[in-house]
């Protein structure tokens, strides 16, 4: 059984969107690009709007939410309003402001559960980090950038079955202790990966000379890309699918 060309193209577009939406900020950035390419114009909330009938517009707030709309050709009383809504964010594990912690010879990331997340699927995955950073440039201006390490930099390993005999049962997961990803092994005689080193890696990879990292809003994501599954490739398997 083969899908129609229209369905195939739609699935490819959806998969590309899901793959690129590694954080809410990346999702909004993609939506803005889609709307702009479709002829929508950006409206700024600090400016007066001059809306035209039939005009296509969008508004972005905090770079984490976006509203696009088409102004009707006729009066609102005649046409009414049609609204479609979706999330730009998804349940995830978000890095704490000072995320580096240590345990049993490892540097780990301190994370908080964001939203109604299923925790078991996060174990034994190749995890990367993405989101938004805020920085100050050489002239003192504040800016922001979207970042994505684009490679697995941490993992939340499961305990071996002989250390947790109830692993296949109703073994509870403590979000404060059981889902801290391992980031690096601390070798005796060498300085462990600490907060300063982690921030310097972000600065070296994503900031220009003279730019100073001030803050971040980052989350983990599984680097495995979305895919079509099933004997006839009739299903889409992807994280974030039910939100975006």
Which residues are covered by each model-predicted region?
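N-terminal hydrophobic/helix-forming segments and targeting peptides
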Residues: 1-244
């Amino acid at each position: 059984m083969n899908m129609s060309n229209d369905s195939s193209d739609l699935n490819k577009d959806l998969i590309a969107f899901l793959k690129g939406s590694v954080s809410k900020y990346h999702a909004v950035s993609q939506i803005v690009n889609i709307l702009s390419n479709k002829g929508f114009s950006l409206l700024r909330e600090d400016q007066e709007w001059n809306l035209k009938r039939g005009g296509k517009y969008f508004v972005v707030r905090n770079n984490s939410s976006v509203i696009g709309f088409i102004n009707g050709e006729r009066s609102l009383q005649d046409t009414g309003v049609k609204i479609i809504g979706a999330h730009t964010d998804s349940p995830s594990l978000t890095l704490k402001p000072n995320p580096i912690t240590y345990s049993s010879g490892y540097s780990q990331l301190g994370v908080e559960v964001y939203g109604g997340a299923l925790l078991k699927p996060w174990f034994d995955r190749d995890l990367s980090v993405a989101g938004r950073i805020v920085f100050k440039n050489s002239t003192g201006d504040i800016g922001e950038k979207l970042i994505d390490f684009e490679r697995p930099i941490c993992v939340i390993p499961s305990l071996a079955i002989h250390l947790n005999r109830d692993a296949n049962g109703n073994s509870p997961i403590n979000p404060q202790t059981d889902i801290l990803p391992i980031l690096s092994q601390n070798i005796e005689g060498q300085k462990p990966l600490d907060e300063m080193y982690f921030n310097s890696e972000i600065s070296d990879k994503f900031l220009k000379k003279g730019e100073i990292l001030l803050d971040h809003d980052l989350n983990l994501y599984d680097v495995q890309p979305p895919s079509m599954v099933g004997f006839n490739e009739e299903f889409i398997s992807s994280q974030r699918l039910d939100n975006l």
